[in-house]
């Protein structure tokens, strides 16, 4: 396993990034392997944090999924297909925050797997300004809750749960707050992408 992780970090192609991301998001559930996992995680975090190329590739990957923001305070909805006029709350809402938190955890060698915990730890380490960390956590919570509520509505109506929401199904109040949450995510993507997500 150590050799696999070393190879993934040394050659950060898309498949290696995906496999490394799985590793960084793992958490032990107990048993005799917990100590081995901790040692392996510490080593891979050290190696990853010391590899600017690997971090750059992970950051680039984290910025691929952008919030669905359109012009004039609207949403950029899916234009065709089964989910036309919907937004993807997972890939364009929850995933961008998870990816940003993972990158910060790698940069700071933060051995945490939970997104909220990673963001709080990054704030405590001075990697994200306190106000920005709080805003991003609140945005993440709102997007995640909106996703769960939408899935519950789908199930209640006899349909299969998915990650797609039609903004037209929301109230003006709900749309405004969801859009504000997406703006927070986009702003943080820009800040971290340009190395500005630190106090100062």
Question: Where do the language-model regions lie?
Answer:
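A nucleotide- and high-energy phosphate-metabolite-utilizing enzyme signature
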Residues: 1-200
């Amino acid at each position: 396993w150590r050799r696999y992780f070393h190879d993934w970090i040394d050659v950060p192609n898309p498949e290696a990034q995906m496999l490394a991301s799985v590793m960084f998001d793992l958490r032990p559930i107990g048993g005799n392997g917990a100590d081995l996992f901790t040692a392996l995680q510490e080593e891979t975090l050290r190696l990853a944090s010391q590899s600017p190329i690997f971090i750059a590739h992970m950051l680039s990957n984290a910025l691929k999924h952008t919030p669905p923001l359109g012009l004039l305070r609207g949403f950029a909805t899916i234009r065709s297909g089964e989910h036309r006029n919907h937004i993807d709350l997972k890939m364009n809402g929850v995933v961008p925050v998870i990816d940003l938190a993972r990158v910060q955890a790698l940069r700071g060698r933060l051995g945490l797997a939970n997104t909220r915990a990673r963001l709080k730890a990054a704030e405590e380490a001075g990697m994200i300004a306190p106000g920005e960390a709080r805003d991003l956590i609140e945005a993440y919570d709102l997007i995640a809750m909106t996703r769960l509520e939408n899935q519950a509505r789908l199930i209640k109506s006899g349909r299969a749960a998915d990650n797609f929401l039609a903004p037209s199904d929301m109230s003006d109040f709900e749309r405004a707050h969801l859009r504000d949450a997406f703006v927070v995510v986009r702003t943080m993507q820009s800040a971290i992408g340009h190395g500005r997500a630190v106090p100062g």
